[in-house]
C-alpha cells in the first residue's frame, strides 16, 4: 500500500549567498507506518556558487519532530539536518537538482535518516513543465517490520496559470 505525502512551508531571508530559514513540514507515509510526522526547523545554508542559475549549497538546520504512528504511538525527537544541494540549468528549458540530507537524532546515537533526491525539470513551453523526481530514503531505526530503505519515482506535468 502506497499512500504518502508531504506538505512543507518555508520562509527564508537570503543575502549574499546566505539563507536563513524556518520551515514547518507535515509528512504521512502509510507504507512506513507514519500516520503523521510534524516538524519545525530553523537554520541556515550558504551557496558557494556565484554563477546565476546555479546552486552549490551546504546547510545546517535544527529540527523538532512529533510523530504519530498508525498504532497511535507518539514520539518526540530532536534532530540535526545537514543538507548538501546542487542545482544547475543545463539548457534554457532543462534544470537538474540534487539534494542530500543527513538527519541524526541528538538523543539516540546511531539513529539517523538519509534522504537523496534527484529532480529533472523540463519546460515544455511557457505554461507546461515536466518534472521527473526520484527519492531515496534510509532510516537506521525504522518501525518493526518496515524496511530501512524506500525509493519512489514521481513524474508530473504542471500547468502555470
Which role does the model predict for each range below?
Residues 17-21, 52-56, 89-96, 122-132:
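Repeated loop/turn-to-beta-strand initiation elements of outer-membrane beta-barrel proteins
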Residues 1-5, 36-40, 54, 74-80, ...:
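Residues that define the transmembrane beta-barrel architecture of outer-membrane proteins
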Residues 122-123, 149-161:
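Outer-membrane beta-barrel "beta-signal"
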Residues 22-26, 42, 58-64, 98-102, ...:
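Transmembrane beta-barrel strands of outer-membrane/channel proteins
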Residues 3-25, 94-97, 102:
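Surface-exposed extracellular loop regions of Gram-negative outer-membrane beta-barrel proteins
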Residues 11-13, 26, 46-48, 86-88, ...:
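Residue-level signature of outer-membrane beta-barrel architecture
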Residues 19, 28-34, 50-52, 66-70, ...:
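Gram-negative outer-membrane beta-barrel proteins
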Residues 7-9, 42, 82-84, 116-118, ...:
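Membrane-embedded beta-strands of outer-membrane beta-barrel proteins
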